[in-house]
């Protein structure tokens, strides 16, 4: 696969302008404007915290559970926003594709970059919330950006692949939204993975092979508490530790290849 020339000055300028435009269009007409970038995941966190922590008493045995839950919520919201916006990006920019010629991948990267910027703002909120709740800052926090990069590449690969299909079959974006609602409960955002491990150790192992679950658990481990179950401290087989990363590599590679193959038809189909 030919690697996109991101370093090209022309491509960088175009990417920057598209990201700025995405931000303006996304919050255009709303009273709170850019504050929604933070408010959406915070509102979801508040609902989940009241229902599962206060009413159902979940997570009482987890250190700093509110931070634990907030980190999972913010990471999930990032993945959800990144893929949903990325999948619809080409169709949303169909008018631009028909007017000028430029690398099509920039459209998807701009949409996912906008989601990444939103996430970084929310990550700052998580860090502040963690410190307020007694989490001691450490150098291990510096590992978190590299873990997040894995989730971004996974989201980008999915966006490339499904976004290319969505140009011709517009049902894909709707199907993905339904799939995401189901996937939310298959990823340890609300509940601790220890609940799954206690019920079925095999199921917990399968859960941890999911790159999304692996990223969420790893971020919690390095950011909040080293009592968090992760792929590399729970799975005894060392080769299995690399499965989530391998899945990400396969998805970003196949997604990029398929997107490149289909991109020549985007202008007439979008």
Where are these regions (language model features)?
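Hydrophobic transmembrane alpha-helices and immediately adjacent juxtamembrane helices
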Residues: 1-270
